[in-house]
Amino acid sequence: MAHPVRVGVGGWSFEPWDETFYPPGLSKAKQLNYMSRKMTAVEVNATYYSSFKPDTFAKWREASPDGFVFSLKAHRFSTVRKTKEDMKKSVDMFLGQGITSLQEKLGPINWQFPGTRKFDAEYFKTFLSVLPKEIGTGPAHAGGGHGG
């Protein structure tokens, strides 16, 4: 089975890109629309730090062309909880904020664990057990690690 190769960046609003990547005078509100026509995917780092409303995800979907994919970074609190119950609450809160409003443009979800976390097989087994098998229209993606 062939899989498409996607090219993207981690975000779309970077001051150093104003008037270099983006055309002069392009408003911040139009940067996603422009970038999504030059690339095929984006990793949304903002979801690691904040929650968003379903309308925001829907606006992102509408601003990007067919075939474009959003890879969301799960909220930072999702991967630091100590008990299964707290893990489930955090995961459910992240998944329940309206990410399925991205519909077919919802791509992989990056569950980034702190680089300081020592490997504990039981911890990761427990964490993986609270993830749903599917979200909306596609599989729930689980990834780990903390790249430099």
Ranges and model annotations:
Residues 1-148:
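Residues lining hydrophobic/aromatic ligand-binding pockets adjacent to catalytic sites
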